[in-house]
Swiss-Prot record:
Localization: Cytoplasm; Nucleus
Family the entry assigns: Belongs to the creA/MIG C2H2-type zinc-finger protein family.
Region (Disordered): 33-52, 229-268, 345-375
Name of the featured protein: Transcription corepressor MIG3
Gene3D superfamilies for the chain: Classic Zinc Finger (3.30.160.60)
Organism: Saccharomyces cerevisiae (strain ATCC 204508 / S288c) (Baker's yeast)
Presence of the UniProt keyword ATP-binding in the record: no
Amino acid sequence: MNYLRDRFPPDNDQRPFRCEICSRGFHRLEHKKRHGRTHTGEKPHKCTVQGCPKSFSRSDELKRHLRTHTKGVQRRRIKSKGSRKTVVNTATAAPTTFNENTGVSLTGIGQSKVPPILISVAQNCDDVNIRNTGNNNGIVETQAPAILVPVINIPNDPHPIPSSLSTTSITSIASVYPSTSPFQYLKSGFPEDPASTPYVHSSGSSLALGELSSNSSIFSKSRRNLAAMSGPDSLSSSKNQSSASLLSQTSHPSKSFSRPPTDLSPLRRIMPSVNTGDMEISRTVSVSSSSSSLTSVTYDDTAAKDMGMGIFFDRPPVTQKACRSNHKYKVNAVSRGRQHERAQFHISGDDEDSNVHRQESRASNTSPNVSLPPIKSILRQIDNFNSAPSYFSK
């Protein structure tokens, strides 16, 4: 008891309320009663929280204990509020209106704001519904994501020409050598269907005509049948056209294309027959390019002989007379003089090799005698070709 008295305050004897057990004095009675519970062990203040068995002798201790229960609830509430805010936070975003093309429907949002992230999500989704959950927090529900692909309307050309074909050289040749053929009336006899006729940028070019024809060549067999129809005035123009076609072929050796047989529906066959022999020459001529092709093939063999070019064959003289009947043109041969045929320079594909070899073998059987031109004429022609003005220089 002496050690307890050493802890008493110095005015302990002057205080009116003293403890009966330890003689400690207090200024107030409730303080004395509270001190008495320490000796008896009484704990009248029990915790009111369900499931908590604790009790306390002092009321302030009970209040301090109750704060532990309330602080845990408040902490859980604060955590739940923080998680809700991190889901969708629309407090600082700018107001946004969606276009009809994005497929976004806004229901019951009012003055709530949508963040920019939701705009990008909504634009990449097919159907987006935004529901208002209060407190300016929106929930985005996406059903089926879809990707918007821009569609460019490209007009379809029924007969496109590959880009490897140089149209600049075609137009330049057509402008320098216009088509002035006397056989332009042949075009009126055939049906002209723009949907089925192959499209060519310029029909006056011998390069384009040579590429469209399946039996195209620089020098063809049928030129000898049209030499008498061309007339003397077309001799110089035919020379220039043949040299221009030769230059265009040499400057563009690999520019050629082929079309399927269905694209050449308006083509007709011209089948001239020679009475003096069994040889029949057939050549496919396009409707849109018949006049130009006939003009380009009227290179006279007499001029070729004077210039010293070509390989000549000995044949009976014939004279042609064209007659028009059901789109087939026959040639009646009449003996008039000596005529020579030039050598062929034919550029064919794999499917035409058999036909070319068959025709060459048949021609060699009918005329086995072949004479080559002298070397002087060849050298003279090379000099003339080199000295000629170039129309293709830039």
